[in-house]
Amino acid sequence: GSSESRPVIYEGSLKKFVEDPEHVLEEATHERALLIAASGGKDFRKDATIYGDLMEEKPGIKWGMSIDMNSCYGCGACVMACTAENNVSVVGKPEVLRAHDMHWLRIDRYFTGNINDPESIQTVFQPMLCQHCDNAPCENVCPVAATNHSSEGLNQMTYNRCIGTRYCANNCPFKVRRFNWADYTGSDSFKNNQDEMNDVVMMMNDDLTRMVLNPDVTVRARGVIEKCSFCVQRLQEGK
């Protein structure tokens, strides 16, 4: 498929890349040249910025994650592991149908090939999580600075400062921020908010079930945004 005559995903083989590293960039470079010409010779995607000196590299550790998309076949095991490790609420299908899904990590699926040749259609899987952008667009729109940047390059959430404006979720280009519409896990202070919830949600409010939660990760409450933390608790343990 395509959008505005552009392919959804660019692909190239390792063999071709070794032979000609610039080959995989040819199509994207050509499209950018057309955009630059149409905008009077200025490459806004490369040169324009509202950050100024903030774009300069800062010394120190910068955490990142490398994902081999050639190996990913969309099994979802990483999603389950993330959910278990970070106490991500299991909200049930009815909540997902209302666009209240809570995954910190999701698997995006893209279809590529010739639409006139069904046999050529292939599926490309892409795990999608918070990219911890160097100059994150979610950070400068929060009125209470609940989301901020650490000295090690992590985009952090301060849950007890969040007032639930959801401006950050609206400004996230990767759509990886999740809002707690209800007290899905552990809270019993909003009984009226639990009347029509799916049974699987109510199970997580049971005292015994709460014992499966990871004690190293904060349990989020109703009305706050949450997202991938790059498993900061494990990074700290590794130090």
Model-found features: residue ranges?
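Glycine- and acidic
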Residues: 59-70, 121-130, 147-157, 210-213
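Long, contiguous, secondary-structure-rich segments that constitute the structural scaffold
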Residues: 1-64, 70, 81-84
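Active-site-adjacent "gating/activation" loops or surface patches in catalytic cores
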Residues: 42-59, 99-141
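Internal, charge-rich low-complexity segments
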Residues: 182-198
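Iron-sulfur cluster-binding cysteine motifs and their immediate structural context
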Residues: 73, 77-97, 106, 135-161, ...
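Short, solvent-exposed loop/helix junctions and linker helices
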Residues: 69-72, 132, 222-225
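Surface-exposed acidic, glycine/proline-enriched linker/cap segments
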Residues: 106-126, 193-231
